[in-house]
Amino acid sequence: MVAIAILAAGKGTRMKSGLPKVLHSLGGRSLLGWVLNSAAEVEPERQIVIVGYRSEMVRESLQAVPGLEFVEQAEQLGTGHAVQQVIPLLQGYEDSLLVLNGDVPLLRPQTLKLLLDTHRRHNNAATLLTAHVPDPKGYGRVICDGNNILKQIIEDRDCTPAQKQNHRVNAGIYCFRWPDLAEVLPKLQANNNQQEYYLTDVVNDLSPVMAVDVEDYEEILGINDRKQLALAYQILQNRIKDQAMAAGVTLIDPDSITIDDTVKLEVDVVIEPQTHLRGHTTIGTGSRIGPGSLIENSQIGANVTISYSVVSDSVIQAGTRVGPYAHLRGHVEVGSQCRIGNFVELKNTKLGDRTNAAHLAYLGDTTTGTGVNIGAGTITANYDGVKKHRTQIGDRTKTGSNSVLVAPLILGNDVTVAAGSTITENVPDDCLAVARSRQVVKPGWRLKQPDPT
């Protein structure tokens, strides 16, 4: 069994934001969301989040995560002080405690498993994660014997010139035998210039303590400012895109493409340049997305083509073509083998299979049957200034160019709407609807010209 404590109380002053640092977004999740996602892989018995700055906002952001416990750190007096807050919650607990930081989002689940397995296998009082970094400036140096048993953690400012050449650093991620930690935590002193309680002081008082190296030092990157956030995003994108290409996805220009971790791509998907896939999006096999497209929180079927378009909160079935310059938003459902062309906007609309809206149309709050053809310039006038109304269009119905369908409205099956018509009344099956002024032609008519003299 293992319990996990996640330090998430800090304000993050260097972020220069009203948002708690751990709630800043990174590739589809918050920083804290990434930590929780990795933590879940070790199947913890308990997960305790230590909150402080804007704690209610942090709690609210995690409402969908089951089984979390929260404890308040009213004053942020260091990492040791933060872990002291969990003592009342773990009375009688006899197993391991993983201590994680809510602003270290790149830590892989397998690294946590390695840390926990090493801790248990050697029956350590504590096991800490270490990394060999190219530039160790600012990190505490870890001194071990030949068996990776900790001898000392030395803060950067206290290192001798020789010790500064040591590139093995403390990642600030620990696994403790909880009864041992609970015994020494209350004795922790703030004997430093910052008057803070450091968890490293506790580690130096426990025995035996072992260090285990992370395979990739980038995993321990902490986020303290916007530049580090951007760096973490680049690292994360490289991970995601490498995994996608290894799984049979073609990325034409990886450097210009962004993909959230929550996106699912099937084999033989092709992503063109300048395309961005966000949120809980799935792309079916054989689909081609882009160039220049944004897909967000949408489910795209197999063999769909989308170019230069924005699709959000929508479902598109197999074989449909979208774009260029289409906009689908607000719970759109498009059937299979449809055509959504240039400068077409769909909002809260459901289109049946084999329906075409090839160009210059707006359909809002609309439902169509199958085989419908929406002529160029057709719009549904769905808003009366107070509320939205729906338009229902039957199978095989056709609207002529420049038609206005004033909702609420029902067009039956096999209806034809004449070009230029404004339809305000329901139209039964098999009817032609014409609603426009009759053309008048006056022979010999021309405007009087001014006298040039």
Swiss-Prot record:
Q: What is this protein called?
A: Bifunctional protein GlmU
Residues annotated as the enzyme's active site: 359 (proton acceptor)
- From the UniProt entry, list the residue stretches annotated as the region Pyrophosphorylase: 1-226
Q: In which pathway does it act?
A: Nucleotide-sugar biosynthesis; UDP-N-acetyl-alpha-D-glucosamine biosynthesis; N-acetyl-alpha-D-glucosamine 1-phosphate from alpha-D-glucosamine 6-phosphate (route II): step 2/2; Nucleotide-sugar biosynthesis; UDP-N-acetyl-alpha-D-glucosamine biosynthesis; UDP-N-acetyl-alpha-D-glucosamine from N-acetyl-alpha-D-glucosamine 1-phosphate: step 1/1; Bacterial outer membrane biogenesis; LPS lipid A biosynthesis
Name the protein family: In the N-terminal section; belongs to the N-acetylglucosamine-1-phosphate uridyltransferase family. In the C-terminal section; belongs to the transferase hexapeptide repeat family.
A single BP term in Gene Ontology:
regulation of cell shape
Question: Which HAMAP family does this chain map to?
Answer: GlmU (MF_01631)
**Source species taxonomy:** Bacteria, Bacillati, Cyanobacteriota, Cyanophyceae, Gomontiellales
Q: Which cofactor does it need?
A: Mg(2+)
Kindly state which keywords UniProt assigns to this record, in alphabetical order.
Acyltransferase, Cell shape, Cell wall biogenesis/degradation, Cytoplasm, Magnesium, Metal-binding, Multifunctional enzyme, Nucleotidyltransferase, Peptidoglycan synthesis, Repeat, Transferase
One GO CC term, this protein: carboxysome
Give positions of region: N-acetyltransferase: 248-453
Enzyme class, top EC level, equals transferase
As one GO molecular function, the record gives: structural constituent of carboxysome shell
Give the location in the cell.
Answer: Cytoplasm
Recorded hits in Pfam families, A to Z, give: Hexapep, Hexapep_2, NTP_transf_3
The UniProt annotation places Mg(2+) binding at 103, 224
Q: What does this protein do?
A: Catalyzes the last two sequential reactions in the de novo biosynthetic pathway for UDP-N-acetylglucosamine (UDP-GlcNAc). The C-terminal domain catalyzes the transfer of acetyl group from acetyl coenzyme A to glucosamine-1-phosphate (GlcN-1-P) to produce N-acetylglucosamine-1-phosphate (GlcNAc-1-P), which is converted into UDP-GlcNAc by the transfer of uridine 5-monophosphate (from uridine 5-triphosphate), a reaction catalyzed by the N-terminal domain.
Q: Which residues bind acetyl-CoA?
A: 376, 382-383, 401, 419, 436
Q: Which reaction does it catalyse?
A: alpha-D-glucosamine 1-phosphate + acetyl-CoA = N-acetyl-alpha-D-glucosamine 1-phosphate + CoA + H(+); N-acetyl-alpha-D-glucosamine 1-phosphate + UTP + H(+) = UDP-N-acetyl-alpha-D-glucosamine + diphosphate
Native source species: Cyanothece sp. (strain PCC 7425 / ATCC 29141)
- Region (Linker) residue spans: 227-247
